[in-house]
Design a protein with these regions (language model features):
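Basic, ligand-binding patches in group-transfer machinery
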Residues: 1-96
């Protein structure tokens, strides 16, 4: 398994949810809304309605997936329903 931890914000609008995609399919939704005062300060977040709860975390059980190379990406959905895809990269799952 592996953990995904991060943060996301959208000034004036706010983030509604963050989903994890593998090969462009939603596999899970993260636990969004964890306190991240450091992000508010470092990124000068002023008007996101979720301040200071901009953090997220998720534990992914890799045994649910075949050993392979996957396209990983986050799908951010703001409170207006606008979708932003972020962080696309290739990840290798290799369960021993």
């Amino acid at each position: 398994s592996f953990s995904i931890n991060g943060w996301s914000y959208n000034e004036d609008v706010g983030i509604d949810r963050v989903q994890v995609l593998l090969n462009q399919e939603v596999i899970s939704e993260v636990n969004y809304g964890l306190p991240r005062h450091d992000v508010v300060s470092a990124m000068h977040v002023l008007s996101d309605p979720n301040i200071p709860n901009l953090g997220f975390t998720l534990e992914i059980d890799t045994t649910k997936f075949e050993n392979n190379l996957y396209e990983f990406e986050l799908k951010l959905v703001n409170n207006l329903g606008t979708v932003i895809r972020y962080g696309k990269r290739m990840v290798s799952i290799n369960n021993l």
